[in-house]
Each structure stands twice: as C-alpha cells, then as structure tokens.
C-alpha cells in the first residue's frame, strides 16, 4: 500500500514546488525541446506523439493535459500553452474540444520564466520511464508559480486544492516575507484571482485559507 500511495502522491496527483504535476512538466518540457517557445504553432497531435517519449499514459490523457494548460480553454489564470482551434471552454456549456489532429499549439511567452535557466545546472535531471532520455525533476521557475494557477489533485491519504492568485501580488508577498517573516500575508495577497472573476462574500475566510492545509 505505501509504495502505491507514495507513487500517486509524488508521481501523479500532487503538484510540486514548481506548480506542476508530472504530466504538465513532461508536456511542457517536450514542447520546449521542440523549439516551441518561438515561431508558430504546430499540430497538437505532433506534440502529443513526442510527449509519449516521456509520458506513457496514452495520447488521450496527454491531450487532455494540453487542453487544460491552453489559453483557449480558459482554465488557468496564466496559461502555459498558446492554442489555435477549438480547445473548448472550461466552466461553460461548450466544454467539448476538437481532436488533436485539428488543433495547433505552442508555448506561451510566460514559459520563458519556466525554462530560462534550465541549461545552467539549476535543476536535476532523471531518466524517463524506459531509461532512454533525461527529463527535469523540476522546472527552474523564476516566480512562485504554484500559487499563480489553480491546481487540484486527489492522491492517496491527501488532496491538493490551490486557488490562483495575481502574479504581482504573489511576488510582492514573497519579497515581503523574505525581508520580514512576520509580514501579514493578507496585507499584500488580498484574495484569490480566478479566471472567471468572483465576489468575496465572507472576507474573514480568505485569511483562513492562506494558512489552511487539507487532508483526507
């Protein structure tokens, strides 16, 4: 039981300190290696096929991951994938997306902050599932990305549910805490910032969420 539980926690369901689950990281790193930080978009099916060298869980799950990370799907406050074609719309009646052979994608400009120092020995590299390639254990992000995009995950014995926050407020709060560990977080990190907007009904609950961890 314990090996299975740890595998799910560390290798599948819970985001790491770089804000990414393994499936996200494998996709984005593959796109980076394909040179998709610059230039135009390419067929999503091409990207999915290449990603299977790092992620053996099948093309459907890889494409689902790409859709969720895309600007067109409108799931993330700061999308990592620029999309072309029908990627569906999260939180709407039109959630269905076109097949990967009909859509195109590339990395969004914010991914420069994910990969800028990756070739400077800033992170460890590990073997992929069949020991034929190397992949980064983490990405050398330059901002607290784990707090900037909404992330949910259900593992074994624990769960993760992190709201998205404004990147400027997150960075200001991080700097303030580095200078003064007694800094009041709610002074600079006002409230979550959701893609679809929202209203704060009970403001005292906001400060509570800053300190609360959830276990199942």
Residue locations for each model-derived region?
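Catalytic phosphate-handling regions of large nucleic-acid enzymes and associated NTPases
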Residues: 1-205
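Conserved small/polar residues in nucleotide/adenosyl-binding loops
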Residues: 209-216
């Amino acid at each position: 039981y314990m090996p299975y539980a740890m595998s799910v926690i560390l290798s599948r369901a819970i985001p790491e300190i770089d804000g990414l689950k393994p499936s996200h990281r494998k996709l984005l790193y593959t796109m980076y290696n394909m040179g998709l930080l610059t230039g135009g978009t390419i067929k999503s099916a091409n990207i999915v096929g290449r990603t299977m060298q790092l992620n053996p869980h099948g093309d459907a799950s890889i494409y689902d991951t790409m859709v969720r990370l895309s600007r067109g799907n409108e799931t993330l406050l700061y999308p990592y994938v620029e999309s072309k074609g029908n990627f569906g719309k999260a939180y709407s009646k039109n959630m269905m997306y076109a097949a990967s052979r009909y859509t195109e994608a590339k990395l969004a400009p914010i991914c420069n902050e994910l990969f800028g120092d990756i070739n400077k020995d800033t992170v460890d590299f590990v073997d992929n599932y069949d020991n034929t390639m190397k992949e980064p254990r983490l990405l050398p992000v330059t901002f607290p990305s784990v707090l900037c995009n909404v992330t949910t995950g259900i593992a074994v014995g624990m769960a993760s549910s992190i709201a998205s926050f404004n990147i400027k407020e997150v960075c200001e709060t991080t700097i303030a805490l580095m200078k003064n560990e007694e800094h009041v977080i709610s002074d600079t990190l006002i409230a979550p910032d959701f893609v679809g907007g929202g209203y704060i009904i009970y403001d005292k609950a906001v400060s509570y969420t800053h300190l609360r961890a959830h276990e199942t």
